């Protein structure tokens, strides 16, 4: 089953993306570079729980 996750910007702007991931195939936390429109740059985004 795919679970919903939140990808939070490491730039400290509070911007986030929501996506899904399969926890069986990727048990570790996701990290990827995505565009942060608040700083207008590509920065690292880390997985966080959706509350």
From Swiss-Prot:
Enumerate the SUPFAM superfamilies for this protein. Answer: Zn-binding ribosomal proteins
Which BP terms from GO are recorded?
Answer: translation
Q: Name one Pfam family in it.
A: Ribosomal_L33
Q: Which InterPro entries match?
A: Ribosomal_bL33, Ribosomal_bL33_CS, Ribosomal_bL33_sf, Ribosomal_zn-bd
Q: Name one GO molecular function term.
A: structural constituent of ribosome
Q: Name one GO cellular component term.
A: cytosolic large ribosomal subunit
Q: Which domain of life is it from?
A: Bacteria
Keywords of the record, alphabetical order, are: Ribonucleoprotein, Ribosomal protein
Its family? Belongs to the bacterial ribosomal protein bL33 family.
Q: What is this protein called?
A: Large ribosomal subunit protein bL33
Q: Which organism is it from?
A: Acidithiobacillus ferrooxidans (strain ATCC 53993 / BNL-5-31)
- Taxonomy-wise, where does this protein's organism fall, top ranks first? Bacteria, Pseudomonadati, Pseudomonadota, Acidithiobacillia, Acidithiobacillales
Gene name of the record = rpmG
């Amino acid at each position: 089953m795919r679970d919903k996750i939140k990808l939070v910007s490491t730039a400290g702007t509070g911007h986030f993306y929501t996506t899904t991931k399969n926890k069986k195939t990727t048990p570790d936390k996701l990290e990827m570079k995505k565009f942060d429109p608040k700083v207008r740059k590509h920065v690292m985004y880390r997985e966080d729980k959706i509350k």
